[in-house]
Curated annotation (Swiss-Prot):
EC number of the protein: 3.1.-.-
List of residues binding Mg(2+): D6, D109
Family: Belongs to the PINc/VapC protein family.
Keywords (A to Z) from UniProt: Hydrolase, Magnesium, Metal-binding, Nuclease, Toxin-antitoxin system
Cofactor(s) recorded in Swiss-Prot or TrEMBL: Mg(2+)
HAMAP family named in the record: VapC_Nob1
Gene Ontology process terms (BP): negative regulation of growth
Name of this protein: Ribonuclease VapC48
InterPro entries per record: Mtu_PIN, PIN-like_dom_sf, PIN_dom, VapC_family
Disulfide partners: none
Domain PINc positions: 15-141
Pfam families: PIN
Length: 145
């Protein structure tokens, strides 16, 4: 089964004050351990860097080099594929976005779903309920229940 994760999972795994920290950290450790195929979407990696280094979003932002090292834990694993837009992405995005008509904060979610479809990724781990607006993907909430 091919799977990926949203920015929130990485942020909660890093942010020790988060009520979801333990669950997120356990999930990230499972992804890092392998051997199952995991996809790191470039917008997720960059979104993580944006959030965890921002001086006002978290109580104690990470130094940029620490945040980059966290991402490199994924990029150094042979079972983790790093993917982004490729030729033919725009028509895939349109097929994902047109039925939902995303605006505002839903646009990045449509972007991730289009990347998933473009690369054949079936499942995304996220607490973001907006992913339910898109058909054809499986959403796993690591923090429910």
């Amino acid at each position: 089964m091919s799977e990926t994760f949203d920015v929130d999972v990485l942020v909660h795994a890093t942010h020790r004050a988060s009520p979801f920290h333990d669950k997120a950290k356990t999930l990230v450790e499972r992804f890092l351990a392998g051997p199952g195929l995991v996809y790191l979407l470039w917008p997720v990696a960059l979104g993580y860097l944006r959030v965890v280094t921002h001086p006002t979003l978290l109580g104690a932002p990470l130094a940029p080099e620490v945040a980059v090292e966290n991402i490199e834990q994924f990029t150094s694993r042979p079972h983790v594929r790093q993917v982004g837009e490729a030729n033919g992405f725009w028509p895939v995005y349109r097929r994902v976005a047109d039925p939902v008509k995303p605006r505002g904060n839903l646009v990045p979610d449509a972007h991730l779903v289009a990347l998933m479809r473009h690369h054949g990724i079936a499942t995304i781990w996220s607490h973001d309920r907006d992913f339910r607006k898109f058909e054809g993907i499986r959403i796993r909430d690591p923090f429910s229940g």
